[in-house]
């Protein structure tokens, strides 16, 4: 393939190929190293008692069950709100909006919001959801703050995926007499499932790893609420917040490594479930 190239270009091609391979290997080594370090240091501290109890000085336990439940509650409510809003906004911008200037303004605003530090979202969430709307410091306020944080990501990934659907698909369906919404529901959205799943995975990663915004809005209590409704209206620490508290407030780094390992496994499990759901949807399509 490189026979027609001059010796200098062949050398340059080899150098660039080597650099690309070196970059790929470096990334894989870094990822494997981080995952390995967290698992090696965290797994020895994980036990059934660690996962199924509440932290108690009297009982001498450092369980994280409340934080696990709080994390799952926050993930569920945030995705339940942000996915319909984000996908709907992306569909409007791609399929319905005709004012190009308006679209550009919205896209620019969306990109700007995606780059705002999470601690600012936490401050705004505290002022709006916790104080102005009277929700107080609770999981509901934290979840709504995370909805605002993750909305730009969902919109952007879904919008880019919608743009990859060939225009001929839409025109062909329209020629057969299909309506606009029918085309979107049966052709455009199924073809865009990759982008939607990608946005979902990115959102889950940000939700699980967020601590600054949740410290302002959700709180840091380690108590199991009685019922789902009570949980959302109660102060509660997620796993990422608890990791920070154990490591930097209590100095319990062994427990912090255990929480880190649980977080890592949780993210991997949710990502795997999202990938499997995408495969199932593609098979149905």
Regions found by a protein language model. Name each.
Residues 78-110, 123, 275-280:
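Transmembrane-helix boundary motif in ABC transporter permease subunits
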Residues 111-147:
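Generic hydrophobic transmembrane alpha-helix motif, especially the helices
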Residues 117, 176-177, 190:
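Glycine/proline-centered hinge or cleavage motifs at structural transition points of membrane proteins
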Residues 93, 159, 163, 201, ...:
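C-terminal transmembrane helix and the adjacent membrane-cytosol boundary/short C-terminal tail
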Residues 69, 73-81, 85, 89, ...:
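Hydrophobic alpha-helical transmembrane segments of multipass integral membrane proteins
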Residues 79, 158, 180-218:
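Transmembrane alpha-helices
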Residues 56-58, 62, 214-264:
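Interhelical loop and adjacent transmembrane-helix boundary motif
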Residues 3-22, 36-78, 99, 245-254:
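Periplasmic/extracellular loop-to-transmembrane helix junction in inner-membrane transport proteins
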